[in-house]
């Protein structure tokens, strides 16, 4: 661990230091140089977003390299449960048959500053908080039943039963997921809160067998006509919306 920290962080930090300061590169858009699909920033040279924080010994060694200006102090600020907040916001925008009265109670709890989203869902669904948190995050990241079963150490049948119970008791989360996926499938675009476009312009065959996603013309030639293909990765639409808005 110490050797890894030395080669991954310390060497890189020293390499890019200039007059005792570090000026890393931030990437707001995905490119060969970095960036993320959702529009979240990444950094490099060095990656100051990944400075170790968990191991107490390594954390002290590496974070101790950074000191504030004389007479100044560091401040640490972070958003509280930013992704769940956005998820609740978008659930509250649902209308018609997609809207469920339960979401209004969740919004009220957020307004009162009393919200623990994962516990709220756990209470509504009647499942342990750990399971609720895993399903909540899995919903935002497009997790399948197999991976859910593996993480929670359940059989696929048990994971399926858990998801069915979750969707029955907390229908507004399934509704926003399905609506976002449907939007991405039909238009190929979803927009984040500030208007950034997240495009779904790759295609795959409609069969559930895994095949490589391709641009439309290539997919038509490879998989046998426009009627046999669909937009790829639309199951990630909710994740793109939440991460991109955050």
Where do the PLM segments sit?
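Conserved catalytic core of nucleotide polymerization and phosphodiester-bond processing enzymes
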Residues: 1-246
């Amino acid at each position: 661990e110490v050797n890894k920290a030395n080669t991954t962080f310390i060497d890189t930090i020293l390499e890019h230091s200039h007059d005792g300061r570090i000026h890393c590169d931030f990437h707001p858009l995905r490119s060969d140089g970095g960036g993320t699909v959702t529009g979240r920033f990444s950094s490099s040279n060095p990656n100051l977003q990944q400075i170790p924080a968990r191991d107490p010994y390594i954390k002290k060694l590496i974070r101790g390299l950074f000191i504030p200006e004389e007479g100044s102090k560091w401040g640490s600020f972070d958003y509280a449960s930013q992704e769940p907040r956005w998820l609740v916001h978008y659930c509250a925008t649902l209308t018609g048959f997609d809207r469920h009265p339960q979401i209004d109670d969740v919004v009220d709890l957020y307004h009162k500053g009393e919200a623990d989203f994962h516990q709220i869902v756990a209470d509504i669904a009647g499942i342990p908080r750990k399971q609720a948190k895993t399903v909540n995050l899995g919903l935002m990241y497009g997790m399948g039943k197999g991976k859910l079963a593996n993480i929670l150490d359940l059989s696929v049948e048990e994971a399926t039963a858990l998801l069915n119970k979750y969707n029955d008791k907390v229908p507004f989360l399934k509704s926003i997921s399905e609506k976002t996926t449907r939007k991405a499938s039909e238009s190929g675009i979803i927009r984040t809160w500030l208007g950034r476009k997240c495009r779904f312009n790759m295609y795959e065959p409609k069969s559930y067998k895994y095949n490589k996603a391709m641009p439309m013309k290539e997919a038509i030639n490879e998989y046998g006509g426009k009627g046999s293909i669909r937009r790829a990765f639309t199951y990630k639409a909710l994740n793109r919306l939440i991460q991109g808005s955050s």
